[in-house]
Regions:
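Bacterial N-terminal signal peptides
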Residues: 8-21
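Sec/Tat signal peptide C-region and signal peptidase I cleavage site
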Residues: 21-27
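Structured C-terminal subdomain patch of bacterial secreted/periplasmic proteins
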Residues: 145, 241-312
Length: 312
């Protein structure tokens, strides 16, 4: 009798133990641009080697132990903000393998621009390679894929879905604001000034297009850009699109307002004469999903506030 009870107890214990083992030793594999990455548990020490990946981690509520070009992120991207105490591991084009190894990461996130170093990174920690920006890609869709995949890896699936739902809600809200105000008729040209004669104009194949389309706005610039989604043109290239509203994305070059005010060509542009020049705060055009939400809100607020005849 005792022997039988002990055997039953032992068998039950073994079954309980075995049922717990998959949770402790479960290994999942994800495919990426240079192969696959296998993880036995959600990573806790993650390093991001580009700003789109940094942004995605922060949106998921994960603070990376290290990022590339930390100070540059604070200047050009800013939001979502980097918490204090994150290590800098060098530049985005040439990160320090030594600095990365010292942080003992259990996951490194990078893109195909770092392909020559991928094998070296893999020796340090499992490495996930995904490129939001490359020839033929659709940036918002790739950024969404990265967010969802990282959410899966890090056991943050619900956070990833919440982020995407929030973005869609924001886009719908801003679209209704513009529609109710009757501000969706004229096309919009999104530009960054490089100097007083040249701009970076954002094309239909870029990240910003997702915001324009969702807001019900036409892109005034009909031409495809490079795989980053822009073209560099002279101001004269805007002239053939007289119906457009020009939205200038900060920052601008010093003294630009005064220079343009004295430029016969600039003051001749129809959008200038109609006082349909708008200027918004910086939005990082080469990020992940978050810049789409930020651009949609800033752009809507600016169009509702009204334009002027010059940049600030």
């Amino acid at each position: 009798m005792c022997t039988r009870l002990f055997s039953q107890f032992l068998a039950g214990g073994i079954i309980c133990l075995l049922s717990a083992l998959p949770l402790a030793s479960r290994a999942d594999t994800w495919q990426h641009e240079r192969g696959s990455v296998t993880l036995k548990a959600p990573p806790e020490r993650v390093i991001a080697l580009n700003w789109a990946a940094t942004e995605a981690l922060l949106l998921l509520g994960v603070t990376p132990v290290g990022v590339a070009d930390r100070e540059g992120y604070k200047v050009w991207v800013d939001k979502p903000q980097l918490p204090a105490g994150i290590a800098n591991v060098g530049t985005r084009v040439a990160p320090s393998l030594e600095a990365i190894a010292e942080l003992k990461p259990d996951l490194i996130v990078t893109s195909s621009e770092m392909a020559p170093a991928a094998d070296l990174l893999q020796r340090i920690a499992p490495t996930y390679v995904i490129s939001v920006y490359k020839a033929g890609s659709r940036p918002f869709e790739k950024a969404t894929e990265m967010l969802i995949t990282l959410g899966d890896m890090l056991n943050r699936e619900q956070q990833a879905q919440a982020v995407l739902s929030d973005i869609e809600d924001t886009l719908n809200t801003q679209k209704q604001r513009l529609k109710q105000a009757g501000l969706t008729e004229r096309p919009v040209a999104l530009v960054n000034f490089l100097d007083d004669r040249h701009v970076r104009i954002y094309a239909p194949n870029g990240l910003y297009q997702r915001a324009l389309s969702a807001l019900g706005l036409d892109n005034a610039w009909p031409h495809q850009g490079n795989y980053w989604g822009f073209s560099v043109v002279g101001l004269e290239a805007i002239a053939p699109y007289p119906e457009s509203r020009v939205v200038v994305i900060s920052p601008t070059v010093p003294g630009l307002s005064e220079t343009l005010a004295n430029s016969p060509f600039w003051t001749y542009l129809p959008s200038v004469r109609r006082e349909q020049i708008y200027q918004i705060e910086p939005v990082w055009p080469f990020g992940g999903v978050f810049p789409v939400k930020r651009l949609a809100t800033l752009l809507t607020d600016s169009l509702l506030a009204g334009g002027s005849g010059n940049v600030r």
